[in-house]
């Protein structure tokens, strides 16, 4: 009986791993569109970011924002494949948060952009016919939370 349970557990883990790889595949295939759409929605919600004096006002700054969103999406994809947000180093994210603070990048919109990407990714997964994808939320929520936390 114990061997049977072990085999069943292994089958479940294999199926879970395969599903996670499929999710990462959908994210990878659609990454450029996910980021582009999220950035567009973000700047519609926060037009002051791309206005004179905003942190994404120049082409160079805008491109850095897009680059950072790509990094966040990639980190989420890695965490999904790994099976959870534990692979995301909280200290690294806290350091990134401190860097953004020192550069005058508002953290609320960064966290909002990450949440927008989560929503878009889940829409892409639904369109691809994938179900039972609640595990996708964890890395996006974790990064958004750590990035937007403030030290007291």
Language-model features: where?
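Core of compact, soluble alpha-helical bundle domains
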Residues: 1-101, 105, 109-111, 115, ...
């Amino acid at each position: 009986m114990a061997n049977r349970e072990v085999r069943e557990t292994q089958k479940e883990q294999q199926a879970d791993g395969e599903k996670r790889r499929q999710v990462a595949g959908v994210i990878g295939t659609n990454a450029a569109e996910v980021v582009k759409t999220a950035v567009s929605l973000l700047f519609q919600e926060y037009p002051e970011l791309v206005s004179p004096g905003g942190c994404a006002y120049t082409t160079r700054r805008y491109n850095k924002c897009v680059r950072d969103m790509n990094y966040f999406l990639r980190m989420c994809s890695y965490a999904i494949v790994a099976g959870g947000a534990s692979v995301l180093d909280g200290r690294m994210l806290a350091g990134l948060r401190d860097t953004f603070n020192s550069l005058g990048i508002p953290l609320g919109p960064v966290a909002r952009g990450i949440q927008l990407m989560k929503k878009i990714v889940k829409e892409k997964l639904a369109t691809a016919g994938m179900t039972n994808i609640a595990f996708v939320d964890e890395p996006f929520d974790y990064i958004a939370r750590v990035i937007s936390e403030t030290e007291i």
